[in-house]
Amino acid sequence: MGNLIKELQDEQLRKEALTDFRVGDTIRVATKIVDGGKERTQVFQGTVMARRGGGAGETVALHRVAYGEGMEKSFLLHSPKIVGIEVVKRGKVSRARLYYLKGKTGKAAKVKEYIGPRAPK
């Protein structure tokens, strides 16, 4: 039974490889939005706060501050609605979850930029 579930989940995975990003990186996620009969692409840019799960159910939580208000948005990485993911800047953090950024604004919400080669996973 468990093998059948795993096979079904593997069919749902993206065929093309996802961009390599980690917690602390600033990424831009382009999603497909359907408004009435029209289809358009909407882009959300934010800092990766958490990356959860694995397989078809893997999610990423992004955080950004716009007009003084903090926003959070979660995305299913293997969703067919995601058009693309682009890494804007690499971040240097010492935590796996950056939930402490929620209450911060301005410079306190900044993540140090990582400069140098990224070691493979």
UniProtKB/Swiss-Prot annotation:
Protein origin, superkingdom: Bacteria
GO cellular component labels: cytosolic large ribosomal subunit
Keywords: Ribonucleoprotein, Ribosomal protein
Gene3D superfamilies: 2.30.30.790
Biological processes, Gene Ontology terms: translation
Pfam family name, one: Ribosomal_L19
UniProt entry tagged with the keyword Ribonucleoprotein: yes
Keyword Cytoplasm in record: no
Gene Ontology molecular-function annotations: structural constituent of ribosome
Functional description taken from the UniProt entry: This protein is located at the 30S-50S ribosomal subunit interface and may play a role in the structure and function of the aminoacyl-tRNA binding site.
Family in the record: Belongs to the bacterial ribosomal protein bL19 family.
Protein name: Large ribosomal subunit protein bL19
Organism: Chlamydia caviae (strain ATCC VR-813 / DSM 19441 / 03DC25 / GPIC) (Chlamydophila caviae)
Gene name tied to this protein: rplS
